[in-house]
């Protein structure tokens, strides 16, 4: 029997990027934050590899990846950022994800997951 229909499986953005792709997104994101003159001082003395690991786990969940049992959100809030600075950090994430051509609702979901505003 011959089939002419294509079978598709719904895939999350995490499936397309994979763990290595999510790490690359986080590295680019942290570079943008570190290049911001107002935000860079908050990263001084911080264990950046550990921060990147936490952010990678949060972002992976926001993009449809496995939860890994980690608590969601608040990583940036603990640094003492103002609301405006916090939004700028999330805007940098949106810029990196937008550069990948991801849909708007996926970008917003990722921002919410990282900010701890949405159940993941």
Question: Positions of the model-derived regions?
Answer:
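Core of compact, soluble alpha-helical bundle domains
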Residues: 1-120
């Amino acid at each position: 029997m011959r089939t002419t229909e294509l079978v598709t499986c719904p895939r999350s953005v995490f499936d397309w990027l994979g763990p290595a792709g999510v790490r690359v997104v986080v590295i680019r994101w942290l570079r943008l934050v570190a290049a911001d003159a107002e935000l860079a001082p908050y990263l001084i003395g911080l264990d950046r590899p550990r921060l990147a690991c936490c952010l990678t786990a949060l972002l992976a969940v926001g993009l449809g990846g496995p939860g890994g049992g980690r608590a969601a959100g608040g990583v940036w809030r603990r640094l003492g950022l103002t609301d405006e600075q916090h939004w700028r950090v999330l805007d940098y994430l949106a810029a990196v994800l937008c550069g990948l051509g991801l849909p708007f609702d996926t970008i917003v979901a990722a921002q919410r997951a990282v900010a701890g505003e949405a159940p993941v």
